[in-house]
Curated annotation (Swiss-Prot):
Function of the protein: Catalyzes the isomerization between 2-isopropylmalate and 3-isopropylmalate, via the formation of 2-isopropylmaleate.
Keyword Nucleotide-binding tagged: no
EC number(s) from the headed UniProt entry: 4.2.1.33
SUPFAM superfamilies recorded: LeuD/IlvD-like (SSF52016)
Pfam families, alphabetized: Aconitase_C
Biological process per Gene Ontology, one example term: L-leucine biosynthetic process
GO CC terms in record: 3-isopropylmalate dehydratase complex
Protein name per the record: 3-isopropylmalate dehydratase small subunit
Protein family: Belongs to the LeuD family. LeuD type 1 subfamily.
Length: 196
């Protein structure tokens, strides 16, 4: 997994609340057996049926910082929702509230989910309305988003922050313990199954 320390990209205003995982990626797109290629399913119902949807606007097609309404990622536990956001190019999502399971899945996959006050979300929406295509710099080390002259703090779980800054997914965490695993396996009787 790639380390996340700082990222600069175009902010995308998703001015909707209660966006559940089925809206992020409908179930019809969940039939793949790989973890990639889900970008076509991202918000597909809105992208297909609403020509004015934010991701249908040229200004935001290459956006990588999603500024969403409250209660983002609710509904069923669906890792595919995180993968779709990342495959599309998003590196960070900010909201005033996330579903816990979505936040956990995001952190494990390398997608930052930062929590801001709703008033700060609305301020960023206003700035993006005034300056479409506004670039934002997400600084995970200092837990800030800089948009023009505006600096906004965000919260993130300390453990997820550490994992993102170290670039550690579950496999990476396990590989940090390879010496201990090998020492344990060396002591196990040969007739027992090996973890290596």
């Amino acid at each position: 997994m790639e380390k996340f320390i700082k990222h600069t990209g175009v902010g995308v205003p998703l001015q909707r609340s209660n966006v559940d995982t089925d809206q992020i990626i409908p179930a019809v797109y969940l039939k793949r057996v790989t973890r990639t290629g889900f970008e076509d399913g991202l918000f597909s119902n809105w992208r297909k049926n609403d020509p004015d949807f934010v991701l249908n606007q040229d200004t935001y097609k290459n956006g990588s910082v999603l500024i969403a309404g409250p209660d983002f990622g609710t509904g069923s536990s669906r890792e595919h929702a995180v993968w779709a956001l990342m495959d599309y190019g998003f590196r960070a999502v900010f909201s005033s509230r996330f579903a816990d399971i979505f936040r956990g899945n995001s952190g494990k996959a390398g997608l930052l989910t930062g929590i801001m006050e709703q008033s700060d979300i609305e301020l960023l929406w206003k700035l993006m309305e005034q300056t479409p295509g506004l670039e934002m710099t997400v600084d995970l080390e200092n837990q800030t988003v800089v948009a023009g002259d505006t600096v906004i703090s965000f919260e993130v779980d300390p453990y997820i922050r550490w994992r993102l800054m170290e670039g550690l997914d579950d496999v990476g965490l396990t590989l940090r313990k390879v010496d201990e695993i090998e020492a344990y396996e060396a002591k196990r009787p040969a007739f027992k199954p090996s973890a290596l």
